[in-house]
């Protein structure tokens, strides 16, 4: 029977102890415990040893659990805060009212009558209170409550033991010779023939090595970098700017009326302070009120400069595009921006209050709507979406407008962003006379499709296993 040097050494030591742990044997053999487990596994395959794996689960108090162990659970603190009875309104001022009241009632410590909370007696410590002192000794149902309330974390520890078998003892008794083995050969050993006198270590090429997890860029960041590289390769220049913008650039410069619902507090994050209006703001005012020097009639009414001075977290990256165009009104311009934007969205599987958006613009003398479709098809194609089609759309600051759709196997046609040519009301105040092609898309939506996710929140969770297992290459082409 062929044994490696380390298998032989382990087997001889097992004769002395019969049963051992990888940690103990690692000290004797001067090898890491993981290596000893590997040697034991090889002996086990040959019937010379047995490797047992025992998993132990332990509960550890969280920071919140430690605090409640010292100060008492919310229900105990709330119970101790009043005498015989108290109104629900009074108890609601207590910092633990929301959690504590429900648990007091569930444990039978109180009853509720006519809007008052009445104690039913002096309660003994609850099972959860007792379990905080020694979580591991608690019954299974109480452990579940501790975990559900976030008072403990569950940790698994694995312990291995290695035991010599009767076959192992027989082989050791028959005599084992320890011979130094060579696992690698030098060029000199091969050319001189010295390798013939060496004891070469045998390798089983059918065995899979243990996985190695090197550093890896987050899949979402990697896709953002891929988008950036594609646009740079297509000749675009990247724009950068602050997430804090004046309402003028975020709304007014894009010909969004000042009474538009998107500007309300429930849709936009407003910040304290005012922003100065830029040089040339009067032409934007005239455009809103009467259409300025164009054929447009504007929105009518009086444009309020104070509303335009409001400070907001940008709701889109188009605010950077129009600022860049205002500073560079002469063609050609070919630029893009990938950045985070903020909206007051209710959190659900497809909406978050902050997300990444990609914005692109092209301004030149002879560009037209067909050029826009060509740019979009080329970009999505390089992202790996080979089937692209376009549907008419509507967006406030582009005309004509279009919605690109890509075909996803199993989902059908999926809309990915919006595009169009900037309206005259957007470009004229800055002296721009050439067509401006513009498009934008939600980066996270593309990521969900590329990675097969159903919940947007998965992109931002600290799930190391998911990061490890997501393929590095996911179908894009350059």
UniProtKB/Swiss-Prot annotation:
GO terms for biological process: phenylalanyl-tRNA aminoacylation. Keywords: Aminoacyl-tRNA synthetase, ATP-binding, Cytoplasm, Ligase, Magnesium, Metal-binding, Nucleotide-binding, Protein biosynthesis. CDD domains: PheRS_alpha_core. GO terms for molecular function: ATP binding; magnesium ion binding; phenylalanine-tRNA ligase activity; tRNA binding. Its cofactor is Mg(2+). The keyword ATP-binding applies. Mg(2+) binds at residue 399. SUPFAM superfamilies: Class II aaRS and biotin synthetases. L-phenylalanine binds at residues 318, 357-359, 397, 422. Its EC number is 6.1.1.20. HAMAP family: Phe_tRNA_synth_alpha2. Tetramer of two alpha and two beta subunits. This is Phenylalanine--tRNA ligase alpha subunit. It comes from Methanospirillum hungatei JF-1 (strain ATCC 27890 / DSM 864 / NBRC 100397 / JF-1).
């Amino acid at each position: 029977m062929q044994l490696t040097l380390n298998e032989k050494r382990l087997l001889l030591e097992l004769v002395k102890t019969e049963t051992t742990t990888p940690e103990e044997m690692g000290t004797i053999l001067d090898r890491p415990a993981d290596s000893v487990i590997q040697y034991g596994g090889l002996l086990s395959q040959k019937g010379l040893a047995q490797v047992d794996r025992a998993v132990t689960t332990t509960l550890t108090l969280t920071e919140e659990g430690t605090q409640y162990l010292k100060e008492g659970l919310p229900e105990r603190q709330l119970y101790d805060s009043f005498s015989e009875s108290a109104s629900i309104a009074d108890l609601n001022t207590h910092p633990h009212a929301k959690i504590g009241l429900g648990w007091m009632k569930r444990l039978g410590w109180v009853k509720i009558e006519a809007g008052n909370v009445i104690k039913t007696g002096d309660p003994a410590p609850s099972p959860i209170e007792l379990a905080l002192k020694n979580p591991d000794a608690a019954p299974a149902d109480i452990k579940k409550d501790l975990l559900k309330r976030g008072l403990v974390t569950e940790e698994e520890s694995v312990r291995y033991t290695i035991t010599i078998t009767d076959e192992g003892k027989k082989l050791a008794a028959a005599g084992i010779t320890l011979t130094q083995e060579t696992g690698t050969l030098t060029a000199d050993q091969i050319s001189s023939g010295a390798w013939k006198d060496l004891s070469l270590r045998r390798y089983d090429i059918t065995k899979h090595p243990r996985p190695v997890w090197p550093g890896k860029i987050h899949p979402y960041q990697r896709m953002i970098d891929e988008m950036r590289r594609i646009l740079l390769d297509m000749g675009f220049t990247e724009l950068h700017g602050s997430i804090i913008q004046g309402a003028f650039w975020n709304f007014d410069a894009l010909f969004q009326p000042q009474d538009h619902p998107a500007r309300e507090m429930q849709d936009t994050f407003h910040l304290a302070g005012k922003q100065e209006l830029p040089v040339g703001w009067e032409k934007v005012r005239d455009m809103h009120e009467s259409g300025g020097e164009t054929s447009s009639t504007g929105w009518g009414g009086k444009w309020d400069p104070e509303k335009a001075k409001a400070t907001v977290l940008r709701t889109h990256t188009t605010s950077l595009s129009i600022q860049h165009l205002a500073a560079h009104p002469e063609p050609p311009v070919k630029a893009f921006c990938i950045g985070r934007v903020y909206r007051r969205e209710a959190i659900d599987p497809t909406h978050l209050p902050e997300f990444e958006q990609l914005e692109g613009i092209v301004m030149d003398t002879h560009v037209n709507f067909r050029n826009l479709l060509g740019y979009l098809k080329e970009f999505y194609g390089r992202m790996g979406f080979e089937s692209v089609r376009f549907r008419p759309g509507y967006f406030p600051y582009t005309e004509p407008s279009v919605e690109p759709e890509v075909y996803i196997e199993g989902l059908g046609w999926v809309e990915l962003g919006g595009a169009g040519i900037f309206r005259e009301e957007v470009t004229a105040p800055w002296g721009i006379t050439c067509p401006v092609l513009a498009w934008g898309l939600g980066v996270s939506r593309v990521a969900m499709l590329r990675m097969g996710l159903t919940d947007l929140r998965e992109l931002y969770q600290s799930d190391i296993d998911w990061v490890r297992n997501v393929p590095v290459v996911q179908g894009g082409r350059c």
